[in-house]
Amino acid sequence: MNFKYIVAVSFLIASAYARSEENEIQSLSQRDVLEEESLREMRGIGTKILGGVKTALKGALKELASTYVNGKRTAEEHEVMKRLETVMRDLDSLDYPEEASERETRGFNQEEIANLFTKKEKRILGPVLGLVSNALGGLLKNIG
């Protein structure tokens, strides 16, 4: 009789442990899903902000480019113009990443592609802001 109770209690303990493990796995998977959703939301917000910044920069760069095109340029201004043209191409490639980097992204999974574009945006926006500030400073210096 004792043996039957020991087996029954052992079975109950084992089934309770299995249920707790199953519940823990489910809660972990739910937590992973929630974390992924929040990451997607943050990326969406970041993408919208970055899109606005890119649009503003492109407008400022086009204005600067038209200013430089209309007047005579020194060698330094010519170099700045070349840099602005390069930056414009890079910003356009951010708007159309499928066309611009199709060769780069073959064989990568989606996460690697997202990381690649994030790194590319950071690599481009840092120098762009410096270049725009230098160009605006030079333009204001020439005007004033």
Curated annotation (Swiss-Prot):
Which organism encodes this protein? Answer: Bombina maxima (Giant fire-bellied toad)
Instruction: Give the signal peptide, or none.
Output: 1-18
What is one Pfam family matched by this protein?
Bombinin
Which residues form the propeptide in this entry? 19-43, 74-123
Report the subcellular localization.
Secreted
Location (main, coarse) = secreted
The record's section on InterPro entries has: Bombinin
Q: What protein am I looking at?
A: Maximins 2/H8 type 1
What is the disulfide pattern of this chain? none
Q: Which GO terms describe its biological process?
A: defense response to bacterium; defense response to fungus; killing of cells of another organism
Is the keyword Transcription regulation assigned to this protein? no
This chain's function reads: Maximin-2 shows antibacterial activity against both Gram-positive and Gram-negative bacteria. It also shows antimicrobial activity against the fungus C.albicans, but not against A.flavus nor P.uticale. It has little hemolytic activity.
